[in-house]
A protein has these predicted regions:
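A polyanion-binding, active-site-adjacent surface
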Residues: 1-86
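A structural signal for short, well-ordered beta-strand segments and their strand-loop junctions
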Residues: 52-57, 91-94, 117-122
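Acidic beta-strand-to-loop metal/phosphate-binding motif
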Residues: 90-103
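C-terminal capping/extension of enzyme domains
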Residues: 103-158
Length: 158
């Protein structure tokens, strides 16, 4: 699984079925797909049929402007996605740096079920193997140097 901030500009219809979403120029999902494809190539494994990457978010409102999205979220009755209750083989965090308005949302991921948590720490140019704190910088995929993340995921996949 991967945990971002919010769906940004991506748009999806409300549905109980798997459907294609309109990315509206949002780059997170294609970037995540490419990272995982490259990790599978690096460890010389085929991507299993019907596999998927669970994308979780701090909150689930679509808005490319994070400040607007936070305001909408604060005034909404938005629910947390029930997928957050699953057990994940590993979780990669890409929610960015410190933002006091997001701290409570980040805190709930301290209880998420996974044996392996990691994020790219660009300040130290390394992978950290823990859940990032509210003040840690968990590098977003935008302008991310992907090679360290690809290497790390490929080792998990072996």
């Amino acid at each position: 699984a991967i945990v971002g901030k919010n769906p940004g500009s991506a748009r999806g219809a409300i549905s109980n079925e798997l459907i294609q979403i309109d990315l509206q120029g949002d780059k997170l999902l294609p970037t995540v797909r490419n990272i995982f494809e490259n990790a599978y190539k690096k460890c010389a494994k085929e991507i299993p049929e019907n596999s998927y990457i669970q994308v979780l978010n701090l909150f689930y409102l679509c808005d490319a402007d994070l400040n607007n999205a936070i305001k909408k979220y604060e005034n909404s009755t938005s629910k947390i996605d029930e997928c957050e209750n699953k057990n994940f083989p590993f979780i990669c965090y890409v929610w960015g740096g410190e933002n006091k308005k997001l701290s409570n949302m980040k805190d709930r991921f301290n209880k998420i079920n996974s044996k392996k948590h990691f994020y790219l720490d660009p300040r130290n140019d390394c992978i950290k193997e823990n859940i990032p704190s509210n003040i840690d910088l968990a590098k977003h995929t935008q302008f991310m140097k992907q090679e360290k993340v690809i290497d790390y995921i490929s080792k998990i996949l072996k």
